[in-house]
Amino acid sequence: MGSAALEILGLVLCLVGWGGLILACGLPMWQVTAFLDHNIVTAQTTWKGLWMSCVVQSTGHMQCKVYDSVLALSTEVQAARALTVSAVLLAFVALFVTLAGAQCTTCVAPGPAKARVALTGGVLYLFCGLLALVPLCWFANIVVREFYDPSVPVSQKYELGAALYIGWAATALLMVGGCLLCCGAWVCTGRPDLSFPVKYSAPRRPTATGDYDKKNYV
């Protein structure tokens, strides 16, 4: 696969992963009510996210409430907010860096510098995926630990929500896309012909006898 194809495929994966990360950040489904034992039949289900909590009635009616106070939130929610938003903003910056270093753009002159810019974009997407993976795994670990904690009442136990799975898929796409971008940039650095240089050859001059030198025909 050529370097241009790697860049395009990597950028598409990163854009899809970026969209998934934004979706996971905004969805109020990081943890959902766990139905255990006598709690199987219930009139409502509770969803909790980074920005709001929602209560879904058995009739299908849903009521959401945005968190009023930041200081009243738990440590993991505050950290997840900061890290997830940072990852989303970093992906936005990485998009412009990647486009500047792409072979199909003229923001940077073709050559090793352009390949290094593209490589920087790939590294930023990799770091973005890792940055988003930290709050997802941290939050999931807390939910699982409280789920198996016998001291936590059954009514307060939660399960992993859909937003966590969407976030994990998004981070996977970001990291795979970042790897492809890095590979495409690495191919460019090892192949000077991809910078499309213009080369001129000096005209051959005949010898004193009027004939061209024999070495020109070897």
UniProtKB/Swiss-Prot annotation:
Q: Which GO terms describe its cellular component?
A: apicolateral plasma membrane; bicellular tight junction; cell junction; cell-cell junction; lateral plasma membrane; membrane; paranode region of axon; plasma membrane
Q: Which UniProt keywords apply?
A: Cell junction, Cell membrane, Membrane, Tight junction, Transmembrane, Transmembrane helix
Transmembrane feature ranges: 8-28, 82-102, 123-143, 160-180
Domain of life from the UniProt record:
Eukaryota
Residue ranges that the UniProt entry lists as topological domain Cytoplasmic: 1-7, 103-122, 181-218
Topologically, how does it sit relative to the membrane?
Multi-pass membrane protein
In terms of Gene3D superfamilies, this protein maps to: 1.20.140.150
Q: Which ranges sit in the Extracellular compartment? A: 29-81, 144-159
* Record-level GO BP terms: bicellular tight junction assembly; calcium-independent cell-cell adhesion via plasma membrane cell-adhesion molecules; cell adhesion; cell-cell junction assembly; establishment of blood-retinal barrier; face morphogenesis; learning; maintenance of blood-brain barrier
The region called Interactions with TJP1, TJP2 and TJP3 is annotated at: 217-218
Where is this chain primarily localised?
other
Q: What's a Gene Ontology MF term here?
A: structural molecule activity
Subcellular locations according to the entry: Cell junction, Tight junction; Cell membrane
Function, as annotated: Plays a major role in tight junction-specific obliteration of the intercellular space.
Summarize the subunit comment. Directly interacts with TJP1/ZO-1, TJP2/ZO-2 and TJP3/ZO-3. Interacts with MPDZ.
Family to which the UniProt record says this protein belongs: Belongs to the claudin family.
Q: What is this protein called?
A: Claudin-5
Recorded name of the encoding gene: CLDN5
